[in-house]
């Protein structure tokens, strides 16, 4: 080859976009969802020979078919949103808190312990206050352990918080065995079923409305906290650059510990609502992987609590709809998971085209 031969250009270049208007961003996301639905429809016809329109109608039926289903969907949305709100300050600070699952479990365990040990020994109103304080403290303490080691010894918070999930599971498992009722069942059943001691109050006859209103209030407070408060500003600065934060005089270690106390405390509230208001029992699966799903919710919403309502709704809708597909059509659960996975893949992939554009060789055509 000649030394002066021109280098061959790559087929395309990936170039970071300037910030897109929100209308165009949402247009790209909607286009991704439509493309995913078309692909899922083709797969449905090829693999199952079912009418894809019937399958999609069944998904909607599974989520909204009855009033009970609608309230179940809103309850699931509220719980996922609550955990998502909890992990968001840490993620915005670039502290990779993978331990939301364990923090919810520990908050739930503290709630269950108060109900089990103090039920009937104090007025119910006082017991509920004790439960609230205990769950917030338990979640916050569990979260601040990895934060302390990160701030003091620069440990890897991803591995630390992930491993603490497994420790939390084993602690909950131990107390479930200790309190099991009846003996040998490996369950503790409904706590205080006859006295309802420690059960959170209901609004009218609706057992979910209180949870939904609490999480809605938390969403508004978190939005204001992150966007308008001094602490929210400090979280943003530390997330952008710890060196810059130190240069302008911020105590980075203090911000890390304070933010994780907040994250753990809100996870503790999620545990309180799950145990004291919804399930009235504790088990190792009560968090139902929300600690991990919340990470996706937070990232897709770009750490905006208001946008998280939409992303939480989408994920919960897909979960409820996919479950209904399996039941109605007698399909393997894996197929409904395939549909969910494809839709999520396209949604996550659309974020690439929101943040980047492709410049092709010769024509330099932009893919928008």
Predicted regions and their residues:
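Short, non-helical or kinked segments that cap or interrupt transmembrane helices
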Residues: 49-54, 91-110, 151-160, 234, ...
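Transmembrane helix-bundle core of multi-pass membrane transporters
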Residues: 157, 161-228, 366-367
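Hydrophobic alpha-helical segments embedded in the membrane of multi-pass proteins
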Residues: 77-88, 109, 140-144, 163-166, ...
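Single transmembrane alpha-helix segments in multi-pass membrane proteins
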Residues: 44-48, 54, 58, 63-118, ...
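Interfacial/capping segments of alpha-helical transmembrane domains
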Residues: 39-61, 179-190
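Cytosolic-side transmembrane-helix boundaries in multi-pass membrane proteins
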Residues: 1-33, 41, 240, 247-254, ...
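Transmembrane alpha-helical segments in multi-pass inner-membrane proteins
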Residues: 261-267, 273-341
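Helix-loop-helix "hairpin" substructures at the membrane interface of multi-pass membrane proteins
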Residues: 204-281, 305-306
């Amino acid at each position: 080859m000649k030394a002066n031969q021109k280098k061959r250009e790559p087929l395309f270049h990936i170039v970071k976009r300037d910030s897109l208007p929100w209308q165009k961003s949402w247009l790209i996301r909607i286009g991704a969802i439509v493309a995913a639905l078309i692909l899922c429809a083709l797969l449905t016809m090829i693999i199952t020979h079912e009418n894809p329109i019937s399958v999609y109608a069944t998904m909607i039926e599974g989520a909204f078919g009855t009033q009970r289903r609608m309230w179940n969907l809103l309850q699931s949305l509220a719980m996922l949103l609550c955990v998502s709100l909890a992990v968001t300050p840490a993620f915005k600070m670039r502290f990779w808190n993978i331990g939301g699952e364990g923090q919810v479990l520990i908050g739930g365990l503290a709630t269950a312990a108060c109900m089990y040990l103090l039920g009937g020994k104090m007025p119910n109103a006082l017991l509920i206050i004790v439960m609230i304080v205990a769950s917030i403290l338990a979640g916050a303490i569990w979260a601040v352990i990895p934060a302390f080691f990160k701030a003091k010894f620069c440990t890897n918070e991803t591995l630390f918080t992930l491993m603490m999930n497994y420790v939390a599971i084993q602690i909950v498992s131990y107390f479930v065995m200790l309190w099991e009722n009846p003996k040998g069942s490996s369950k503790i059943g409904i706590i205080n079923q006859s006295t309802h001691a420690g059960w959170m109050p209901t609004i009218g006859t609706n057992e979910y409305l209180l949870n939904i209103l609490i999480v809605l209030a938390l969403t508004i407070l978190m939005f204001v906290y992150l966007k308008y408060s001094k602490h929210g500003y400090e979280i943003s600065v530390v997330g952008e650059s710890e060196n810059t934060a130190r240069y302008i005089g911020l105590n980075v270690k203090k911000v890390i510990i304070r933010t994780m106390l907040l994250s753990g405390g809100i996870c503790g509230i999620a545990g309180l609502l799950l145990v004291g208001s919804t399930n009235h029992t504790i088990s190792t699966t009560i968090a139902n992987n929300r600690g991990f799903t919340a990470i996706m919710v937070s990232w897709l919403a770009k750490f905006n609590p208001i946008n998280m309502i939409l992303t939480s709704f989408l994920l919960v809708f897909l979960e409820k709809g996919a479950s209904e597909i399996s039941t109605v059509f007698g399909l393997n659960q894996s197929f409904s998971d395939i549909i969910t996975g494809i839709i999520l893949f396209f949604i996550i992939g659309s974020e690439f085209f929101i943040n980047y554009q492709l410049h092709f060789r010769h024509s330099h055509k932009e893919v928008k």
